[in-house]
Amino acid sequence: MAQTLTEFDTIAAISTPIGEGGISIVRMSGEDAVKIANEVFKGADLTKVPTHTIHYGHIVDPDTDKTIDESMVTVLRAPKTFTREDIVEINCHGGIVVTNHILQLLLSHGARMADPGEFTKRAFVNGRIDLTQAESVMDIVRAKTDKARQVAVGQLAGGLLHKIQAMRQEILDTLANVEVNIDYPEYDADTVTAKQMADTAKSVIKKIDRLLKTAQEGKILRNGLATAIVGRPNVGKSSLLNYLTQSDKAIVTDVAGTTRDTLEEYVSVKGVPLELIDTAGIHHTDDKVEKIGVERSKKALDRADLVLLLIDASQELTAEDKALIEETKDKKRIIVLNKSDLGQKITVDEMKKQTGSDVILTSILKEKNLDKLEELINKLFFAGIENSNDQVMVTNQRQTSLLTKAKKELQDVVQAVEDGIPIDIAQIDFTGAWDTLGEITGESAPDELVTQLFSQFCLGK
């Protein structure tokens, strides 16, 4: 990208959530950040203090000489900052009025309101981080479990960046020799055959495949696993939701049909972030309100990554149970045989044989075997991942799509070589794969893509 830090103006934004709190932070970045802060700060002369120091004083409106708040001001000088520009962070008392007043004061003295994600964008443009690291900043903020945080921290440290760079270098080394072979065919000593180019393509494809295998887990860690709790009325769906969330969000009674809409809640189960959806009992009803809930339940079922299908083990299978077993057969699911404390007319072995699914016998009321249910959820989605020391994962659709595209280009290289196509023609896809991998890190990403990516960030980041 063409911009350098000297071409940027000075930006400001509130970096903490708006609302009441102990402390709020107003952040500035840019060439004039220290000068602007010094104009509204009564205390040490900020233009003369050392970098990476914090100073007590008061924020004062120079036009009225009125004190806005007492504060601690941190001065961080380029280039050893997040944006590689001068940064000033004003720590003031939390509260909407005082925080906005300080922000407006900075804007009136020459700063500009930052766009969403602009601080992180400047870190990228100034070479402080790559695009995968930039994405990890928001992943850390949005992490729903400690495992998600660990993966995001690994990305921020450059885990995925280093793997992508290594693949690009492998392609580039071969590509450079291919260019020599094409331009100077008379020098046979350094000739790189088409087979060698195909071998490099195969080597990189294997590395891409290893990353793509983590894409599903990465997506789940980033967005949560959409988990629909389904079953006919009064089989314990709401009780399971309340157990997993340790709350009483759902109404629990012995009256069928008390949940008339879908309830959603995020919860961590053995490190797996679940977006739990407690559905209304899926059954035939003439009640207009219940009908709406049943339709919404069916839509929730359609988008679910995992289905927890609850069946009353103390009763024989009903027509509604059988219909739900059929309706969810193509979903990844766990069948939960509940109410085992009331007797058992359905066995685990019978249900496994009939459905081919994982089956757990429980009593949610007595909290029996619910720990085994949690372990099974973890095993289904994170087998071999949870205890791995390798925290590098593909965590979003952008990364997955580009890796898939690069793999296809490399597969085309291999096919071209096998078909005897001239090396200079096969080289086109080889170069394309190198560029595509560069889009993941931002080394060859178009400006429009970069702008669109950072627009999804929150203000102050």
Swiss-Prot record:
Domain TrmE-type G: 224-382
GO cellular component, one term: cytosol
Keywords from the named record: Cytoplasm, GTP-binding, Hydrolase, Magnesium, Metal-binding, Nucleotide-binding, Potassium, tRNA processing
Protein name stated in the entry: tRNA modification GTPase MnmE
Domain of life: Bacteria
HAMAP family reported in the protein's UniProt record: GTPase_MnmE (MF_00379)
Binding site for Mg(2+): S238, T259
GO biological process, one term: tRNA methylation
Cofactor dependence: K(+)
Xref: Gene3D superfamilies: P-loop containing nucleotide triphosphate hydrolases (3.40.50.300), Probable tRNA modification gtpase trme, domain 1 (3.30.1360.120), tRNA modification GTPase MnmE domain 2 (1.20.120.430)
Pfam families: MMR_HSR1, MnmE_helical, TrmE_N
Subunit and partners: Homodimer. Heterotetramer of two MnmE and two MnmG subunits.
Positions that bind GTP: 234-239, 253-259, 278-281
Top EC class, one word: hydrolase
Subcellular location, principal: cytoplasm
Similarity field: Belongs to the TRAFAC class TrmE-Era-EngA-EngB-Septin-like GTPase superfamily. TrmE GTPase family.
EC number: 3.6.-.-
Record bears the keyword Nucleotide-binding: yes
Residues at which (6S)-5-formyl-5,6,7,8-tetrahydrofolate binds: R27, E89, R128, K461
Comment on bound cofactor: Binds 1 potassium ion per subunit.
Molecular functions (GO terms): GTP binding; GTPase activity; metal ion binding
Biological function: Exhibits a very high intrinsic GTPase hydrolysis rate. Involved in the addition of a carboxymethylaminomethyl (cmnm) group at the wobble position (U34) of certain tRNAs, forming tRNA-cmnm(5)s(2)U34.
Binding positions (K(+)): N234, T253, V255, T258
InterPro entries documented for this protein: G_TrmE, GTP-bd, GTP-bd_TrmE_N, GTPase_MnmE, MnmE_dom2, MnmE_helical, P-loop_NTPase, Small_GTP-bd
